[in-house]
């Protein structure tokens, strides 16, 4: 595809799409935002006008039929992701999907295999993989600066839904019954992905717990309070095939600023901490320590890890997503080899999420990969 602009159609014109996805596409001169779709046509028209798209529609299949659209970007409610992703791949489009690609890892495997069989590039909205600090730390690990990685600790937690009056996007998970995954899938997924990437190894076993700390919440669809039996806080331990170990925690009811991520890697020759939190006017810091200097000292992130015009004082939303969309454009246009953060990576993450859910409900370690029975007991 070298030599042409990349046509993009965005499905979903909500806040995250306006804050991160569409600004990322229009920031890249190699890309053209052709169309915006939303079930609320007014939102689609407003976003199209704001970002210069020539088409606004309430029917996503219209985007799939257009020859001037190469990439479909899915930024809808979680429950709609898989249907739209599948239709887009079947239509021969490259796909960027917000997480999760699907709630069940088996569905993620199906669509990952379909996309590969058709020679299509895919990407999951693992926003924080594209943070300059996170990417520079990956380069440091790969260079051997930390030696052999032993331990990975990570969390994503902030106050997004600490207030019960802050409405959730839908009432899909309202009611009683078994505790349903929420924070683990929304907040845990990005740091699980970074863990796989940093440790260069798959998780082989997990054990975890989930909690529902705020049982009643305002439901966006109804405007009323209701029982919402979801995990709003969780933690798990994991073992990697390499012999390394990890702890991962997520919550959207913990006091703290956005995005609220910290990842730590401890190796045989050093340790590093990437902290992605908007504090003191900047959105991230990177610190490193060595065996002969155990105080963690801030590391300057080279300019090449930032998008054009980017800096640590930019909003993390646009900063990280500009890197993500630029990376995907480069992959689709054939300017770089590979396809990182794709649906295969999404599969590995979703399988861990499903395994931790099993672990919580069955109170046991769960081995990976999952089998048809939902994981072997240990």
Feature map (PLM): residue ranges:
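Hydrophobic residues in well-ordered beta-strands that form the structural core
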Residues: 17, 57, 96-97, 103, ...
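Contiguous beta-strand/loop segments that form the cofactor/metal-binding neighborhood of enzyme cores
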Residues: 186, 193-285, 322-336, 368, ...
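Predominantly a Rossmann-like dinucleotide-binding segment in NAD(P)-dependent oxidoreductases
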Residues: 15-16, 128-228, 363
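Beta-loop-alpha module in the N-terminal Rossmann-like domain of NAD(P)-dependent dehydrogenases
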Residues: 51-114
């Amino acid at each position: 595809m070298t030599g042409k602009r990349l046509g993009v159609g965005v499905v979903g014109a909500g806040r995250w799409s306006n804050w991160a996805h569409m600004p990322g596409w229009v920031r890249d001169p190699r890309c053209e935002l052709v169309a915006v779709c939303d079930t609320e046509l007014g939102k689609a028209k407003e976003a199209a006008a704001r970002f210069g798209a020539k088409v606004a529609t309430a029917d996503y299949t219209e985007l799939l039929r257009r020859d001037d659209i190469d990439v479909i970007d899915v930024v809808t409610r979680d429950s709609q992701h898989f249907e739209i992703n599948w239709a887009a791949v079947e239509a021969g489009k490259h796909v960027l999907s917000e997480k999760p690609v699907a709630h069940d890892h088996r569905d993620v495997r199906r669509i990952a295999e379909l996309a590969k069989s058709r020679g299509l590039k895919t990407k999951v909205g693992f926003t924080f993989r594209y943070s300059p600090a996170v990417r520079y730390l990956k380069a440091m690990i790969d260079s051997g600066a930390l030696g052999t990685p032993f331990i990975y600790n990570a969390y994503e937690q902030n106050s997004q839904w600490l207030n019960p009056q802050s409405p959730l996007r839908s009432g899909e998970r309202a009611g009683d019954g078994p505790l349903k995954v929420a924070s683990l899938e929304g907040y845990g997924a990005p740091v699980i992905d970074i863990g796989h990437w940093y440790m260069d190894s798959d998780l082989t076993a997990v054990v975890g717990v989930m909690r529902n700390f705020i049982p009643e919440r305002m439901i966006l669809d109804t405007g009323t309070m209701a029982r919402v039996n979801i995990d709003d806080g969780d933690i798990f331990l994991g073992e990697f095939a390499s012999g390394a170990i990890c702890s991962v925690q997520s919550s959207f009811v913990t006091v703290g600023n956005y995005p609220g991520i910290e990842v730590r890697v401890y190796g045989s020759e050093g340790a590093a901490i990437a902290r992605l939190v908007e504090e003191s006017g900047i959105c991230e810091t990177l610190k490193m320590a060595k065996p002969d200097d155990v105080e963690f000292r801030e590391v300057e992130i080279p300019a090449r890890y930032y998008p054009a015009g980017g800096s640590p004082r930019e909003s993390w939303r646009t900063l990280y997503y500009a890197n993500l969309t630029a990376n995907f454009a480069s992959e689709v246009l054939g300017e770089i080899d590979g396809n990182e953060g794709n649906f295969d990576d999404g599969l590995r993450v979703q399988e861990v999420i499903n395994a931790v859910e099993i672990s919580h409900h069955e109170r046991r370690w769960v081995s990976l990969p999952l089998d048809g029975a939902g994981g072997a007991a240990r």
